[in-house]
Amino acid sequence: MSLQQLTHDEIDHLSMIELGVKILKEENKAMNYKVIFNKIAELKDFTDEQKQNMMAQFYTDMNVDGRFLTLGSGMWGLKRWYPVEQAEEEITEEPKKKTKKKKKKAEVIDDVDDDLDVTDDEIDDIVSDLGDDLDDDDFEDDLDEDLEDLEDEVDELEADEDVEDENDDDNTR
C-alpha cells in the first residue's frame, strides 16, 4: 500500500520507523536521514517543537532497527537492498597512507647524520686541543710529590722499627 493511499488515522498508528521503511520502499533508493525524517514529520503533522524532540529518537531507532543500513554521509537505505560484500565496501573507508610522515622522519634522520659526519682530521684536532690543555709538567710534578711522600713514610716506618729493635735489645740484656 502506498503512502498516499493511507488515511490520516493509519499514519498516526504507524511508528516513525514503519513510515521510514515505507518511504524508502516507495522511493526505491537510499536517502538522506533528514529528508526521510522531514517526510515522516510532514505525514504525521509534527510541529517544530515535536520535530526537535523526535529527531534524535528516530535516528536512534534507525540505528537499532535491523532493517536500515547507513551508507555514510547521512545516507540511509534498506539493508535488504545491499548484498553483504557491497555494503561492506561502501561503508569501509580506505585507510590513508602515511608515507608523508615517514618521509619527514627520514629527512630528519638524514639531517642528523649530516651533523654527525666528523672527519679523522677533525678528531685529531680535538684530541690535540685536549692534550694542549693538560700540562704534562704538572702531572710529573704530582707524581714526584707522591713518590716523595711514600719515601718519607717508608723512612718513618724504618725508624720506628729501629727504635723497637733497640728497645728489645735493651730488654734482653
From Swiss-Prot:
A GO cellular-component term linked to this record: DNA-directed RNA polymerase complex
GO biological process: DNA-templated transcription; regulation of DNA-templated transcription
Residues covered by the HTH HARE-type domain: 14-81
InterPro entries: Asxl_HARE-HTH, RNAP_delta_N_dom_sf, RpoE
Segments of skewed composition (Acidic residues): 109-173
Key words, A-Z: DNA-directed RNA polymerase, Nucleotidyltransferase, Transcription, Transferase
A Pfam family hit: HARE-HTH
Protein family: Belongs to the RpoE family.
NCBIfam families: RNAP_delt_lowGC
Subunit (UniProt): RNAP is composed of a core of 2 alpha, a beta and a beta' subunits. The core is associated with a delta subunit and one of several sigma factors.
Task performed by this protein: Participates in both the initiation and recycling phases of transcription. In the presence of the delta subunit, RNAP displays an increased specificity of transcription, a decreased affinity for nucleic acids, and an increased efficiency of RNA synthesis because of enhanced recycling.
The name this protein goes by in its record: Probable DNA-directed RNA polymerase subunit delta
Source organism of this protein record: Oceanobacillus iheyensis (strain DSM 14371 / CIP 107618 / JCM 11309 / KCTC 3954 / HTE831)
Record lineage: Bacteria, Bacillati, Bacillota, Bacilli, Bacillales
